[in-house]
Protein backbone atom coordinates (compact mmCIF):
# COMPACT_ATOMS: atom_id res chain seq x y z
CA UNK A 1 0.00 0.00 0.00
CA UNK A 2 1.15 3.59 -0.68
CA UNK A 3 -0.18 6.92 0.52
CA UNK A 4 -2.04 8.79 -2.22
CA UNK A 5 -0.53 12.12 -1.16
CA UNK A 6 2.98 10.64 -0.83
CA UNK A 7 3.54 7.43 -2.86
CA UNK A 8 7.06 7.14 -1.45
CA UNK A 9 5.55 6.12 1.90
CA UNK A 10 4.83 2.42 1.46
CA UNK A 11 3.35 -0.09 3.89
CA UNK A 12 3.65 -3.81 3.26
CA UNK A 13 0.68 -5.40 4.98
CA UNK A 14 0.38 -9.09 5.80
CA UNK A 15 -2.32 -11.06 7.59
CA UNK A 16 -2.39 -14.68 8.66
CA UNK A 17 -4.22 -17.46 10.44
CA UNK A 18 -1.70 -19.83 12.01
CA UNK A 19 -2.49 -23.50 12.62
CA UNK A 20 -4.61 -24.09 15.75
CA UNK A 21 -3.20 -27.46 16.88
CA UNK A 22 -1.53 -26.84 20.26
CA UNK A 23 0.76 -29.84 19.84
CA UNK A 24 2.27 -28.65 16.55
CA UNK A 25 4.27 -25.68 17.70
CA UNK A 26 6.97 -26.80 15.27
CA UNK A 27 4.64 -26.15 12.32
CA UNK A 28 3.56 -22.80 13.76
CA UNK A 29 7.19 -21.81 14.13
CA UNK A 30 7.90 -22.74 10.52
CA UNK A 31 4.81 -20.84 9.34
CA UNK A 32 5.69 -17.55 11.05
CA UNK A 33 9.31 -17.64 9.86
CA UNK A 34 8.41 -18.43 6.24
CA UNK A 35 5.83 -15.66 6.35
CA UNK A 36 8.34 -13.17 7.76
CA UNK A 37 10.88 -14.13 5.10
CA UNK A 38 8.29 -13.47 2.39
CA UNK A 39 7.50 -10.04 3.84
CA UNK A 40 11.21 -9.26 4.10
CA UNK A 41 11.65 -10.06 0.40
CA UNK A 42 8.75 -7.74 -0.45
CA UNK A 43 10.30 -5.01 1.69
CA UNK A 44 13.63 -5.42 -0.08
CA UNK A 45 11.88 -5.08 -3.44
CA UNK A 46 9.47 -2.22 -2.70
CA UNK A 47 10.87 -0.55 0.42
CA UNK A 48 8.57 0.74 3.13
CA UNK A 49 7.55 -0.71 6.49
CA UNK A 50 5.83 -3.93 7.48
CA UNK A 51 2.59 -4.49 9.40
CA UNK A 52 1.70 -8.10 10.20
CA UNK A 53 -1.59 -9.04 11.83
CA UNK A 54 -3.86 -12.01 12.37
CA UNK A 55 -4.72 -15.01 14.50
CA UNK A 56 -1.34 -16.45 15.47
CA UNK A 57 -2.76 -19.08 17.84
CA UNK A 58 0.06 -18.41 20.31
CA UNK A 59 -0.21 -16.77 23.73
CA UNK A 60 1.88 -13.82 24.99
CA UNK A 61 3.95 -16.07 27.28
CA UNK A 62 4.78 -18.54 24.50
CA UNK A 63 8.15 -19.20 22.90
CA UNK A 64 6.89 -18.15 19.46
CA UNK A 65 5.65 -14.81 20.83
CA UNK A 66 9.09 -14.33 22.37
CA UNK A 67 10.73 -15.06 19.01
CA UNK A 68 8.63 -12.44 17.19
CA UNK A 69 8.89 -9.78 19.90
CA UNK A 70 12.59 -10.17 20.76
CA UNK A 71 13.99 -11.46 17.47
CA UNK A 72 15.55 -14.70 18.68
CA UNK A 73 14.76 -17.96 20.46
CA UNK A 74 16.85 -20.85 21.78
CA UNK A 75 14.98 -23.98 20.76
CA UNK A 76 17.16 -26.13 23.02
CA UNK A 77 15.07 -24.81 25.91
CA UNK A 78 11.66 -25.18 24.29
CA UNK A 79 9.44 -28.18 23.61
CA UNK A 80 7.49 -28.31 20.36
CA UNK A 81 4.43 -29.08 22.49
CA UNK A 82 4.71 -25.78 24.37
CA UNK A 83 6.03 -23.46 21.65
CA UNK A 84 2.63 -21.80 21.26
CA UNK A 85 1.85 -21.72 24.97
CA UNK A 86 -1.62 -23.19 24.55
CA UNK A 87 -3.16 -26.08 26.44
CA UNK A 88 -6.26 -27.99 25.35
CA UNK A 89 -7.49 -29.18 28.74
CA UNK A 90 -6.68 -26.21 30.96
CA UNK A 91 -7.89 -22.60 30.77
CA UNK A 92 -4.51 -21.26 31.96
CA UNK A 93 -1.15 -20.91 30.27
CA UNK A 94 1.52 -23.22 31.66
CA UNK A 95 4.44 -22.32 29.44
CA UNK A 96 6.22 -20.24 32.08
CA UNK A 97 6.16 -23.26 34.41
CA UNK A 98 7.86 -25.45 31.81
CA UNK A 99 11.14 -23.64 31.27
CA UNK A 100 13.04 -26.75 30.24
CA UNK A 101 11.02 -29.54 28.70
CA UNK A 102 11.87 -33.22 29.15
CA UNK A 103 12.02 -33.54 25.40
CA UNK A 104 13.89 -30.61 23.89
CA UNK A 105 13.02 -29.50 20.37
CA UNK A 106 16.66 -29.99 19.39
CA UNK A 107 17.74 -33.47 20.50
CA UNK A 108 20.68 -33.97 18.11
CA UNK A 109 22.75 -32.00 15.62
CA UNK A 110 20.90 -33.60 12.70
CA UNK A 111 18.36 -31.57 10.70
CA UNK A 112 14.84 -32.47 11.75
CA UNK A 113 12.17 -33.37 9.24
CA UNK A 114 8.51 -34.22 9.19
CA UNK A 115 6.01 -35.32 6.62
CA UNK A 116 3.47 -32.71 5.62
CA UNK A 117 1.41 -32.77 2.43
CA UNK A 118 3.62 -35.48 0.93
CA UNK A 119 6.73 -33.35 1.29
CA UNK A 120 9.75 -33.54 3.55
CA UNK A 121 10.66 -30.30 5.25
CA UNK A 122 14.23 -30.05 6.51
CA UNK A 123 15.05 -27.73 9.41
CA UNK A 124 18.43 -26.02 9.43
CA UNK A 125 20.10 -23.87 12.08
CA UNK A 126 18.31 -20.68 10.97
CA UNK A 127 15.10 -22.47 9.97
CA UNK A 128 15.76 -21.84 6.34
CA UNK A 129 13.76 -24.57 4.64
CA UNK A 130 14.76 -26.93 1.87
CA UNK A 131 11.67 -28.70 0.53
CA UNK A 132 11.91 -31.95 -1.38
CA UNK A 133 9.12 -33.90 -3.03
CA UNK A 134 7.84 -36.70 -0.82
CA UNK A 135 10.07 -39.72 -0.44
CA UNK A 136 10.39 -42.47 2.11
CA UNK A 137 14.14 -41.92 2.37
CA UNK A 138 15.27 -38.37 3.19
CA UNK A 139 18.45 -37.22 1.47
CA UNK A 140 20.79 -35.34 3.81
CA UNK A 141 23.49 -34.90 1.15
CA UNK A 142 23.27 -31.10 1.38
CA UNK A 143 22.80 -30.90 5.12
CA UNK A 144 24.62 -28.34 7.23
CA UNK A 145 27.68 -29.78 9.02
CA UNK A 146 26.98 -30.55 12.71
CA UNK A 147 29.60 -28.05 13.90
CA UNK A 148 27.67 -25.26 12.14
CA UNK A 149 24.29 -26.10 13.63
CA UNK A 150 22.80 -23.94 16.36
CA UNK A 151 19.65 -24.21 18.45
CA UNK A 152 19.13 -20.43 18.28
CA UNK A 153 16.61 -19.22 15.71
CA UNK A 154 16.62 -15.59 14.53
CA UNK A 155 13.46 -13.90 13.29
CA UNK A 156 13.79 -12.23 9.85
CA UNK A 157 12.02 -9.00 10.86
CA UNK A 158 12.29 -6.60 13.81
CA UNK A 159 8.66 -6.31 14.93
CA UNK A 160 6.85 -4.87 17.93
CA UNK A 161 3.30 -5.40 19.14
CA UNK A 162 1.09 -2.35 18.65
CA UNK A 163 -1.02 -3.15 21.72
CA UNK A 164 1.96 -3.84 23.97
CA UNK A 165 3.65 -0.65 22.79
CA UNK A 166 0.69 1.46 23.93
CA UNK A 167 -0.69 -0.55 26.87
CA UNK A 168 2.55 -2.16 28.07
CA UNK A 169 0.65 -5.44 27.78
CA UNK A 170 -1.49 -7.29 25.25
CA UNK A 171 -5.23 -6.73 25.21
CA UNK A 172 -7.10 -9.58 26.92
CA UNK A 173 -8.92 -11.61 25.81
CA UNK A 174 -8.99 -11.71 22.01
CA UNK A 175 -10.59 -15.16 21.98
CA UNK A 176 -13.48 -16.16 24.22
CA UNK A 177 -14.41 -19.84 24.39
CA UNK A 178 -15.93 -21.90 27.18
CA UNK A 179 -12.63 -23.60 28.02
CA UNK A 180 -10.18 -21.07 26.65
CA UNK A 181 -10.18 -17.33 27.18
CA UNK A 182 -6.89 -15.90 26.08
CA UNK A 183 -4.99 -13.65 23.69
CA UNK A 184 -3.92 -15.13 20.35
CA UNK A 185 -4.42 -12.20 17.93
CA UNK A 186 -1.86 -9.45 17.34
CA UNK A 187 -0.92 -6.49 15.17
CA UNK A 188 2.86 -6.32 14.71
CA UNK A 189 4.71 -3.38 13.19
CA UNK A 190 8.20 -2.15 12.41
CA UNK A 191 9.68 0.68 14.46
CA UNK A 192 9.63 3.13 11.54
CA UNK A 193 5.94 3.59 12.33
CA UNK A 194 4.37 4.97 15.50
CA UNK A 195 1.21 3.40 16.96
CA UNK A 196 -1.13 6.12 18.24
CA UNK A 197 -4.10 4.23 19.68
CA UNK A 198 -5.71 0.78 19.75
CA UNK A 199 -9.17 -0.70 20.17
CA UNK A 200 -9.60 -2.57 23.47
CA UNK A 201 -11.19 -5.99 23.80
CA UNK A 202 -14.55 -6.25 25.59
CA UNK A 203 -14.20 -6.42 29.38
CA UNK A 204 -14.82 -9.62 31.27
CA UNK A 205 -17.65 -7.85 33.07
CA UNK A 206 -19.46 -7.43 29.76
CA UNK A 207 -18.69 -11.02 28.72
CA UNK A 208 -19.75 -12.75 31.93
CA UNK A 209 -23.32 -13.10 30.67
CA UNK A 210 -22.05 -15.42 27.92
CA UNK A 211 -20.61 -18.89 28.40
CA UNK A 212 -18.86 -18.85 25.07
CA UNK A 213 -18.73 -17.28 21.62
CA UNK A 214 -19.97 -17.14 18.94
CA UNK A 215 -23.54 -16.67 20.11
CA UNK A 216 -26.68 -14.76 19.16
CA UNK A 217 -25.07 -11.45 20.20
CA UNK A 218 -21.38 -11.91 19.32
CA UNK A 219 -20.94 -13.53 15.89
CA UNK A 220 -17.32 -14.67 16.28
CA UNK A 221 -15.09 -16.40 18.83
CA UNK A 222 -12.47 -13.68 18.22
CA UNK A 223 -12.72 -9.96 18.92
CA UNK A 224 -11.56 -7.40 16.34
CA UNK A 225 -8.24 -5.63 16.76
CA UNK A 226 -7.64 -2.11 15.49
CA UNK A 227 -4.51 0.03 15.61
CA UNK A 228 -3.92 3.53 14.28
CA UNK A 229 -0.39 4.39 13.12
CA UNK A 230 1.50 7.54 12.27
CA UNK A 231 3.66 6.93 9.20
At which residue positions do the language-model features occur?
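Metal-dependent phosphoester-hydrolase catalytic domains
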Residues: 1-5, 23, 30-33, 37-51, ...
Amino acid sequence: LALVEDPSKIVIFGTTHILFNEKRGDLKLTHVILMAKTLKKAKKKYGGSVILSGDFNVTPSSAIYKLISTGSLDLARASQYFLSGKMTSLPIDLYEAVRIARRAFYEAPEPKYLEQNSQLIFYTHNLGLDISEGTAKPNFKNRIPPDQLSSVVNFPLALKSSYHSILNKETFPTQFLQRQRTTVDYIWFEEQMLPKRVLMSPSFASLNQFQTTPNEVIPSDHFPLLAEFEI
